[in-house]
Amino acid sequence: MRVAVETQGSRWQDWLLDIDDVTLSPKPPSSGMDTDWSALDQIIERLQADQSRVRRISLKVVVFDDADLAYAKEVHRRYPGVPFYLQTGNADVADSDVDALRAKLLSRLEWLVEQAAESEELADVHILPQLHTLLWGNKRGV
């Protein structure tokens, strides 16, 4: 059995060495949180240095706006050898109209794809929507 985890990457946990797929998702400016770069550096360095198992490490930044996109570029520059994902954010967590929400999310996804296509820095990133939101909207418990 393979085990995957996603964490914001702000605090080292020894059990991360037992995980097969680790996605580090530092919080962008829109979250109101500050990134502890030294903690993130340490986590990535420790995971990469551990040769006891084959492990996939990746980074993901959720992008809501231009400031988040600039932050994502900074993260990608800082860790160029780590597979990198961009994901659109859902700012409208109260909307119960799934079709309207999907239209907004797809519009944001189109914007993000266009921004990445225009940026040489982001030529090798993977771009994803929030699949659970596209499927179920803001429904809880799914």
Please annotate each region the language model reported.
Residues M1-V142:
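Conserved AdoMet/S-adenosylmethionine-binding subsite of the radical SAM
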